[in-house]
């Protein structure tokens, strides 16, 4: 599995895929990333350190993802991320977190004092019924502005039966209204019961994507490995 890469288009940054103890919300119907986990924090740190040692700081910006939330990374890994940022001139670091951990974000910012911490939330869609009844995301808030209040960036998931051009456009517009940047992920076949809908994907690619392909605030991942990490 590739765990280090560089994103050179749009917001240039290095990216690392680290390993935590396991996603606290493994019930999302569309996701099997939570299989990338280990209960042994010492083993996790050893792996994560080897990945972080590849970071150069050349862009001054680092995105850190794991198969869950940043709060599932061990304390040694978090401290090492901070050290790497300080030592290699990284002034901006991006982390991902589930909505349920939003109240822990201020403490994380304090821990990374002097570094601009950007928090990304996996929203998937602002359609409450679709998100909770179909995707089983576990976000009990329906108001977009409240969901986004503690976050600067958001992940959205398109290409599933039941989504329409109107629903996808609404998600993008609301995401750009309440967040600094968004990342659109196209559903890829995996081990879950949620499968890609080629008609919905074609609608996005042909009718929506051209409007945002060059938008510096919008990342678009047709494949889940387009950032160069994962497998």
PLM regions: where:
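N-terminal pre-core extensions flanking Radical SAM catalytic domains
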Residues: 4-7, 27-30, 217, 221-231
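Core AdoMet radical
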Residues: 33-48, 57-74, 85-103, 116-141, ...
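Acidic (Asp/Glu)-rich catalytic clusters
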Residues: 52-57, 81-88, 106-116, 142-149, ...
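Distinct, well-ordered alpha-helical segments
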Residues: 73-82, 102-112, 165-169
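Short, aromatic/basic amphipathic alpha-helical patches
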Residues: 79-84, 107-111, 197-212
